[in-house]
From Swiss-Prot:
GO biological process, one term: fatty acid biosynthetic process
Gene (UniProt): accA
Enzyme class: transferase
InterPro entries: Acetyl_CoA_COase_a_su, ClpP/crotonase-like_dom_sf, COA_CT_C
Record-given protein name: Acetyl-coenzyme A carboxylase carboxyl transferase subunit alpha
Source organism of the structure: Nostoc sp. (strain PCC 7120 / SAG 25.82 / UTEX 2576)
Pathway in which this enzyme or protein is active: Lipid metabolism; malonyl-CoA biosynthesis; malonyl-CoA from acetyl-CoA: step 1/1
Record note on quaternary structure: Acetyl-CoA carboxylase is a heterohexamer composed of biotin carboxyl carrier protein (AccB), biotin carboxylase (AccC) and two subunits each of ACCase subunit alpha (AccA) and ACCase subunit beta (AccD).
Job description of the protein: Component of the acetyl coenzyme A carboxylase (ACC) complex. First, biotin carboxylase catalyzes the carboxylation of biotin on its carrier protein (BCCP) and then the CO(2) group is transferred by the carboxyltransferase to acetyl-CoA to form malonyl-CoA.
Pfam family, one: ACCA
Alphabetized PROSITE patterns for the sequence: COA_CT_CTER
GO molecular function, one term: acetyl-CoA carboxylase activity
Family membership noted in the UniProt record: Belongs to the AccA family.
EC id: 2.1.3.15
Amino acid sequence: MATTERKPLLLDFEKPLAELANRIDQIRQLAEENGVDVSGEIRKLETRAMQLREEIFSTLSPSQRLQVARHPRRPSTLDYIQAISDEWMELHGDRCGGDDPALIGGVARLGGKPVVILGHQKGRDTKDNIARNFGMATPGGYRKAMRLMEHANKFSMPILTFIDTPGALPTVVAERQGAGEAIAYNLREMFSLDVPIICTVIGEGGSGGALGIGVGDRLLMFEHSVYTVATPEACAAILWKDASKSPQAAVALKIVSHDLKNLGIIDQILPEPTGGAHSDPLTAATTLKQALLDNLDELDRLTSQERRQLRYDKFRKIGVFTEVAH
């Protein structure tokens, strides 16, 4: 995982932090130029900056969490794979003539145990994002994912999926190639696999594109990730014909981790470093690795039949509600 120093990319709600950081730099520079000791004042300002960061990130709105989830420097699937696993080997091709770079997968070792890892992969710059379709997988990508999952099932290797996509690729070509069928096939087949499956939302979890690799025994989610049936912008455009109402849509859609945990859709929230996973990728990766190891240890104690039944029951409960008679 890259740790090189780069100029931070600030989100709009982080501007007060930037102003305070600039003030600290100015005071430090003036003190050096004039030979004045202002270390006490700087310590106070740095403490205030830490407190302000914690205040801001503990009270984020759903639309602000969405900005964090979409941060260009948020750790990607490949970042996490490189940070948490050993002996990673990427496997290519859907065996139908394609190899979608937006959905990657391969074999690795996690804690010394062989696993199959797959996930959506966004780009790090404009050129890379275009090449990877901004993490929006084609039908071939989902077929490649299914091929790797069948490989995992054959050789009794647990499956780890990392979800980070606004949705499946929404093009005419993708529809002609059977986008709906490819995702539906994955949904059906993932329920029948014998091996443990752990799915983690590391950034955006959007629509059927997320579900295509999202059926598992456990569904984990980073604190500032989002998981939704449609992007708030799309929802606002559909319901109100006005994409500017996406903040209201984000609230109504219940896209954030604590809402989804309360609704029983996700199983565990992974805490992020203050400032988001992009502010301290190694700490985020350590949290993810430990959560995966803990959950794998629990799932390994179950028989394949027990896992399949629990997996089925988990998803059957989603969306159940109680109707109150008037």
